[in-house]
Design a protein with these regions (language model features):
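Central regulatory/effector-binding core of bacterial HTH transcription factors
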Residues: 96-162
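C-terminal regulatory
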Residues: 141, 155-281
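Conserved amphipathic alpha-helical core elements
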Residues: 41-42, 263
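A late-sequence structural motif
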Residues: 268-306
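Short helix-loop hinge/linker segments at domain boundaries
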Residues: 54-57, 64, 75-100
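Short helix-boundary/capping micro-motifs
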Residues: 12-28
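A short LG(V/I)-centered, amphipathic sequence patch enriched
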Residues: 42-59
C-alpha cells in the first residue's frame, strides 16, 4: 500500500506533540482525521507506532525508527513544493511564500527586529514566521527554514547543513563611571578578582573570564566573583548602569548606554573569548538554503551587517 505524504505528516506531528489534538491543530484537521491517518499508516507498516493509554501517547521503538524516514520524506516533499513556488516567483518577478526563521532572543530583539520590517515591506507577498529562542532547534523536525545562531567562527560547519556568516559581534567589558569612582578602574585582567562582576549567563556558563591581548601569546583566564547572573544581556546592562559592577556584554546590548556615558569601557586592550562566539551564522539544510526567498533573506541580512 502506498503511503501518502499527508499520512506521514500526521504521524510526524503526532510524534512532535505527543498528542492527536495537538497534531490536528498544527495541520488544521479534526482529531478524527489525524487518528484515521495514523491508523492507516500502522496498518500499512504492519506494526504499532504509538503506545497509547488514557492519559498519554508515546512512540514505540518501531515508531522511533520510522520517524526519521517520515521526517525526511515530509521535508523533501515540502521542499519540492517550495522550489516550484520559487521557480514561479522568479519567473513572475517576486518572492512569495513563508520563511520560518529562528534567532537568539537577545540578538533577535536588539538587531534582527530592526532589519526584518524593511525586508517584509520590500517583498509584500512574503511571510516571515520568527521564533526567538536560545535553544538549538532541530531544523528538519521543527520545520525551520533558516536558523540564525551564535558561532565561534565565520564558517560554522555542521554535518548535513549549509552555513553562511551574517554578522560579527563584539564583546566588551563595561562599567558605570560611579562604580569605577568607588572601586577603581582595572588596568590588568587580574584586577577583576577584586571587583564585583556580572555575567550574561546561559547554560554551561561559569565565572571564568577568558581573554586575549595582542601582546600575549596565550589567552589568560581570570576567576571572577559574580554577584549577578541573568540570561538576558539587557538586564545585565541595566544592573551595570545601576553601579552593580563590571559586566561582559555584547556591544549591541549597551550601545546607547555607551553613547550617553552611562557606561564606559574598561580593559579595552583585551578581547573577551566567550562561549557564545563572536559571529551570527545562518544555518539551513542545503535544500532550504537554495530556496530563492531564503537566499534573498540571507543576502539582505549580510548587507545590513556590512
Amino acid at each position: 500500500m502506498t503511503v501518502s505524504v499527508d499520512t506521514l505528516s500526521a504521524f510526524v506531528e503526532v510524534a512532535k506533540h505527543l498528542s492527536v489534538s495537538g497534531a490536528g491543530k498544527a495541520l488544521g484537521l479534526p482529531k478524527s482525521a489525524i487518528s484515521k491517518r495514523v491508523a492507516s499508516l500502522e496498518a500499512s507498516v504492519e506494526t504499532t507506532l504509538f503506545s497509547r493509554s488514557t492519559r498519554k501517547i508515546a512512540l514505540t521503538s518501531a515508531g522511533e525508527l520510522y520517524l526519521d524516514f517520515a521526517q525526511r520524506t515530509v521535508l523533501q516533499a515540502a521542499t519540492a513544493i517550495e522550489n516550484v513556488k520559487d521557480l514561479h516567483a522568479n519567473t513572475s518577478g517576486g518572492l512569495s511564500g513563508k520563511i520560518r526563521l529562528t534567532a537568539p532572543v537577545s540578538w533577535g530583539q536588539q538587531v534582527l527586529a530592526r532589519h526584518l520590517p524593511a525586508f517584509v515591506t520590500l517583498h509584500p507577498q512574503l511571510e516571515i514566521e520568527l521564533q526567538l529562542s536560545d535553544r538549538t532547534m532541530d531544523l528538519a523536525y521543527e520545520r525551520i527554514d533558516l536558523a540564525l545562531r551564535w558561532s565561534s567562527s565565520p564558517l560554522h560547519g555542521l554535518p548535513g547543513l549549509s552555513s553562511e556568516q551574517i554578522a560579527s559581534v563584539d564583546w566588551i567589558y563595561v562599567a558605570a563611571p560611579d562604580y569605577l569612582a568607588r572601586a577603581g578602574t582595572p588596568v590588568l585582567p587580574q584586577a577583576l578578582a577584586d571587583h564585583s562582576c556580572m555575567c550574561y549567563w546561559q547554560e554551561n556558563a561559569d565565572d571564568a573570564w577568558v581573554m586575549l591581548n595582542n601582546r600575549a601569546a596565550e589567552p589568560i583566564c581570570v576567576r571572577v566573583s559574580s554577584r549577578f547572573h541573568a540570561n538576558n544581556p539587557e538586564t545585565v546592562c541595566l544592573a551595570t548602569i545601576a553601579g552593580c559592577g563590571i559586566a561582559l556584554l555584547p556591544g549591541y546590548a549597551c550601545t546607547q548606554a555607551l553613547k550617553s556615558r552611562k557606561l564606559v569601557r574598561v580593559l579595552r586592550d583585551w578581547t573577551p573569548v566567550t562561549k557564545f562566539g563572536t559571529h551570527i551564522t545562518a544555518v539551513a539544510t542545503p535544500e532550504r538554503m537554495r530556496m530563492a526567498r531564503v537566499r534573498a533573506l540571507v543576502a539582505y541580512l549580510r548587507a545590513q551587517a556590512a
